[in-house]
Amino acid sequence: MNNPWKNLPETQPYILPSDYELIDFENRNLSHDTIIQHHVLPEPYIGDPNAPIILLNLNPGYADEDVAFYNQKHVRILWKKNIHHSSMDYPFWFLDPSLDVEIGGARWWQTKLKEPIKTAGLQKVANRVCCIEWFPYHSRKFARLNKIIDSQNYGFHLVQKAISQKAIVIVMRSEKLWFESIQELRSYKHIYRLNSPQNVAISRKNCPTGFPLIETILMS
């Protein structure tokens, strides 16, 4: 499947042409908290989708500080390389040490991946972990749209490819939606859940069945 994100407009609104009509319609009825924030760059996935560890999340959140974060030239360069699946030293680009870890997604992800980073270091985690979002656009709170938008199918394709490559899959949030969208996940042997979908830290305590395997992969 071709990568549709190469067609994302370079100016606002940051919505794929194939998604625009439905998102524009839905946004008219969404609340302040659930409206889709198309003035910041979307995050359909973070990292190399061929990584051996795949995290399944719901959608990228939104805070007011994200505007300044994504407007940084260096951030936009890293974001574009990621979205195009270009070669990077830190494919999970929120772990790139050149970023300010006190702002935006860099702070959030370094907190959630604290134990894997402590185990293997930033670069190994950045090269062996990928997160795929069920819904690619930012919002303060998630609200399911009435239909699947076109770009979601590419994310589903990446997960199906990861399954075929026998990656381990960690469900961070919204198992029900992921299982509805990708039937293969229901019977997949290498899938693990977190004890707390509210605190989605990837840790031994929060993912007791999967974390030992994560450690093994990171240290190999």
Task: Give the predicted meaning of each segment.
Residues 75-130:
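Low-complexity, serine/threonine/proline-enriched polar segments
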Residues 24-29, 101-105, 141-142, 164:
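N-terminal start-of-chain detector that recognizes signal peptides
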Residues 1-99, 152-154, 158-160, 181, ...:
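Active-site and ligand/interface coordination hotspots across diverse enzymes
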Residues 32-35, 107-114, 148-150:
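A short linear-motif detector with a strong N-terminal bias
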Residues 1-7, 117, 127-220:
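Glycine/proline-rich loop-helix segments at beta-alpha junctions forming the active-site rim
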Residues 12-13, 121, 166:
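Short, flexible coil/linker elements and helix-boundary hinge sites characteristic
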Residues 47, 61, 104-105, 121, ...:
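Residue-identity detector for glycine
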